[in-house]
């Protein structure tokens, strides 16, 4: 059986470094990543992709996306399935190395946003936003928010949240239920 080289990339195409559970502050819900976690023991996508076929992601599979992948996406509970499919397409097109390098860049920007603009109620909101937005959009949002670093946290957080929502509307993204 192959060991995943990219433990922070789900077989399904999920970018673990942008997942709300990866950034959770609760030890009960925190996940170390799809390739490192005990979750993979029950993940049928992991079993099929890595254990049975020795693939790094489903992007390597000729029948992807398959029903197993869709069933897995329904179980997760975050609005991420469309992004998984987009990610698998990008991995197939550009290679996992290039795709994951961008994910790490997004992660660094996410961690900066969580450090300066997070009011303890928006972690999932930030993670999903950074998962869906293109890197240039994220850089633009974070750069614009930098000017407010000296403001009170609640004001910074509200302003950043509004900017992110506005950007989502401009890109016709419906990421959140609200």
How would you name each of these model-derived features?
Residues 1-178:
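Cysteine-centered metal-binding/redox modules
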């Amino acid at each position: 059986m192959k060991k995943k080289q990219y433990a922070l990339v789900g077989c399904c195409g999920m970018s673990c470094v942008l997942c709300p559970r990866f950034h959770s502050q609760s030890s009960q819900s925190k996940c170390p990543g799809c390739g490192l976690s005990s979750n993979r023991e029950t993940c049928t996508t992991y079993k099929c992709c890595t254990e049975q076929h020795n693939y790094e992601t489903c992007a390597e599979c000729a029948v992807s996306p398959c029903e197993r992948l869709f069933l897995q996406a329904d179980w997760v509970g975050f609005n991420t399935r469309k992004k998984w499919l987009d990610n698998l397409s990008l991995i197939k097109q550009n290679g996992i190395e290039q795709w994951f390098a961008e994910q790490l860049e997004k992660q660094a920007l996410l961690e900066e946003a969580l450090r300066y603009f997070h009011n303890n109620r928006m972690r999932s909101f930030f993670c999903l936003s950074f998962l869906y937005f293109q890197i240039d959009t994220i850089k633009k949002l974070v750069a614009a928010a930098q000017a407010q670093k000296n403001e009170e946290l609640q004001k910074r957080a509200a302003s950043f949240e509004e900017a992110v929502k506005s950007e989502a509307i401009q890109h016709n993204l419906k990421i959140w239920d609200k």
